[in-house]
Amino acid sequence: MKYEAVIGLEVHAELLTESKIFCSCTTKFGGEPNTHVCPVCLGLPGTLPVLNKKVVEYAVRAGLALNCTIANFSKMDRKNYFYPDLPKAYQISQYDLPLCSNGYVEIEVDGKVKKIGIKRIHIEEDAGKLLHENTDGSLVDYNRAGVPLIEIVSEPDMTTPEEAYQYLTKLKNILEYTEVSDCKMQEGSLRVDTNVSVRPVGSTELGTKIELKNLNSFRAVQKALEYEIKRQIKVLEEGGTIVQETRRWNESKGITEPMRTKEEAHDYRYFPEPDLVPIIVTDEWKEEIRKSLPEMPHHKRERFIAEYGLPEYDAKIITSSKKMADFFEKCVLEYDSPKTVSNWLMGEFSRLMNETGKEIDEVPVTPQMLVKLLKLIDNGVISGSIAKTVFEEMFGTGKEPEVIVEEKGLKQIANENELREIIKKVIVENPKSVEDYKNGKEKAMGFLVGQVMKATKGKANPQLTNQILKEELSK
Amino acid sequence: MAISRSEVEHVAKLARLKFSQEEIEEFTVQLSKIIDYVNKLNELDTENVEPTAHIVPIHNVFREDEVKPSMDRDKILMNAPYKENGCFKVPKIIE
């Protein structure tokens, strides 16, 4: 029998507000434990929460960017469970009347566009952090408790791990563009849970779903889904049944394994939050927020093609991250060859970012530094191939390109007399190739140029080398 | 009975309350009576009545997104029965 998977994703994104959702404590990441807390986010008796207006605006902004319907009337609810990371023993969230619903994201898989539905987006407060150190108990840091989150719940519209990966990439891209979240998975500002079940192809009934946790990267989501789908199919093919449970992705072993859950019953006894009043988003307010939406990826892509003459392929890659698009535009402001900038961003820059797993804003190279490097090439100070070496050094150390060129003695040899001496020596040392060239073998020329580059450690000016070499050989 | 014994046990478990067998029996009877009483409300026709989200008829009470100083950590931890390294200490949670 052939099986297909049904995948749904739940994404939690921390909102980029300055203060927490219900109190004025800072949302800054890190900080000494329990230094960003107050009686409100600790849920001390007698305190009352007051909703941060920006949380509503950011959630609506995300909802609009994700094609959602914005609820005119919305309210907060209490989700009850006991766990030490939750100081009040309930989380203030939204249950039956979320702020946004019925949106979608378009993804591209194998050249085809597919719409992935977004069921809902609601606002809620984050919980604290449990530290399991070498003590006889667990330690709790409530700095994160009360940081605003949006939870984005997809429809179970994905059928392959690749589609899940594409959905997450697109979602992150849009959230970054809307500037409501910085989406840093390593700091926990973007977190992903996924539900997956399998069923025979053609069946309309859903199989028993498994929830997967501990997914620390989009690749981990993809790998965990690949493993889990195979596991479920194997169980079914051997005549077994899938038991509904939460499983944890074990990255080092590359497997999913059963996990103990917080509340055995999944019985959260939601009820309306009596300490907070309903939220009404009028059409005027909604339109005001819509106007504050920055340029979205597909608009930016079209503009980059029209304004900078970038090929569609380049424009798509450069705008796939807002940070890269911003970096590009800053470079182009000072350097009038957009295609050269895009080549560098898609080439060396992306290669080193992939190798180091860094995002563009975590790299010490600034747009000004890249522009300086490009100008060094244009002015003949360094060759294009040496520039790659210089760039690698810039990427690793954050040093200015001209400093690196100076320190490492990488300046191009463009002095005709100096270069002629080196070339003469190469000609004397390679009589066979010289003879081949004179007998009409064009390839021998390339070999000789290579020898000159070798002798100068790549610093010879290529045009000048060619010119002098031809002169000397025709003597 | 409007509520079963096992439901009472379930609710008690969710609330982390521990009762003797006699107490469970007693509460099952008492809670059933309360639910029967409240069930009277079900006799009303609420077809065209909006569900109440809040008893006070106001909405959109917000604060601006401004950071104010948090509370001093020594004060925060003052009433905590167990603390360590600036954290609240709780019984070991095994993930």
Swiss-Prot record, chain B:
Instruction: Please indicate if the UniProt record lists ATP-binding as a keyword.
Output: yes
Enzymatic class = ligase
Spell out where the chain crosses the membrane.
Answer: none
The record's keywords, sorted A to Z, are: ATP-binding, Ligase, Nucleotide-binding, Protein biosynthesis
What are the GO MF terms of this UniProt record?
asparaginyl-tRNA synthase (glutamine-hydrolyzing) activity; ATP binding; glutaminyl-tRNA synthase (glutamine-hydrolyzing) activity
Q: Which InterPro entries match?
A: Asp/Glu-ADT_sf_sub_c (IPR036113), GatC (IPR003837)
Could you say which protein family the record assigns here?
Answer: Belongs to the GatC family.
Q: How does this polypeptide assemble, per the annotation?
A: Heterotrimer of A, B and C subunits.
In terms of HAMAP family, this protein maps to: GatC
What is the official name of this protein in its record? Aspartyl/glutamyl-tRNA(Asn/Gln) amidotransferase subunit C
Where does this protein come from, organism-wise?
Answer: Thermoanaerobacter pseudethanolicus (strain ATCC 33223 / 39E)
Query: What's the encoding gene here?
Result: gatC
